[in-house]
Design a protein with these regions (language model features):
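Alpha-helical scaffold segments
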Residues: 1-100
Length: 100
């Protein structure tokens, strides 16, 4: 199971009750694979958004810190954040500008 999710993060959707280690391997490979994890820990959530900012859309009520990590990874992730603070907006714009 671990080898499968290390190769393809989405393989986690076929695993019942994956361990924390398997969850971690999945989101390290593909952050958006978090959508297949029921009640992921905050640590798993953070790894997911650091791997792919768009993973934030699969996190219920993300904290300001989680939102910040998402837009630092990909400024365009702001598109999927509900009511971002001014700080989050500013960091997102700076990140997008730095990509040009």
């Amino acid at each position: 199971q671990l080898a499968a999710v290390k190769q393809h993060g989405y393989e986690i959707k076929f695993i019942k009750n994956p361990s924390e280690a398997i969850q971690l391997a999945a989101v390290k490979r593909n952050g958006t694979s978090i959508k297949f994890i029921k009640n992921p820990s905050e640590a798993i959530q953070l790894v997911a958004v650091k791997q792919d900012g768009y993973a934030i859309q699969y996190i219920k009520n993300p904290s300001e810190a989680m939102q910040l990590a998402a837009v630092k990874q990909d400024g365009y992730a702001i598109r999927v954040i509900s009511n971002p603070s001014e700080e989050i907006k500013l960091v997102a714009v700076k990140q997008i500008k730095s990509m040009r």
